[in-house]
Amino acid sequence: MHNKIVRIASSALTGGKLLEKLKPLTRWEVQWDPNKTKCLGITREVTFKDYETTWAFLTRVSMRSHLWGHHPLIHTSYTWVKLELHTHDIDPKDGAHSQLSDIDVRMAKRIDSYIDEMTT
């Protein structure tokens, strides 16, 4: 089996579209700019039951990230994981760099599904 890497183009989320896309991501913390006008990204922390489950989860996230060409920032220590999602390469016409994009939301939903499967 061959997995083809497909880099998904991203577009910044702003205004009403941003708020609409954030609604289902209730387990993610929103990171705002100092003026609270731009979403800079989202973070989520999770603790797994053991080391093996933690790394099984991280493997799934890394494989999906690689396939989509969009990689979260990951911090981990034994059973604890913190994920940060934001997009660096948004076209400047869409606003400041490093903000939330549609691909971040898509990745967050996929990560949520992995967490749900591995913590129940």
Swiss-Prot record:
EC number, as in UniProt: 4.2.1.96
Misc: Present with 752 molecules/cell in log phase SD medium.
PANTHER family according to UniProt: PTERIN-4-ALPHA-CARBINOLAMINE DEHYDRATASE (PTHR12599:SF0)
Keyword Lyase: yes
One Pfam family in the UniProt entry: Pterin_4a
EC class name: lyase
UniProt protein name: Putative pterin-4-alpha-carbinolamine dehydratase
TM segment ranges: none
GO CC term, one of those recorded: mitochondrion
Keywords: Lyase
UniProt entry tagged with the keyword Methyltransferase: no
Gene Ontology molecular-function annotations: 4-alpha-hydroxytetrahydrobiopterin dehydratase activity
InterPro entries: PCD_sf, Pterin_deHydtase
Organism of provenance: Saccharomyces cerevisiae (strain ATCC 204508 / S288c)
Sequence similarity: Belongs to the pterin-4-alpha-carbinolamine dehydratase family.
GO biological process, one term: tetrahydrobiopterin biosynthetic process
Catalytic activity of the protein: (4aS,6R)-4a-hydroxy-L-erythro-5,6,7,8-tetrahydrobiopterin = (6R)-L-erythro-6,7-dihydrobiopterin + H2O
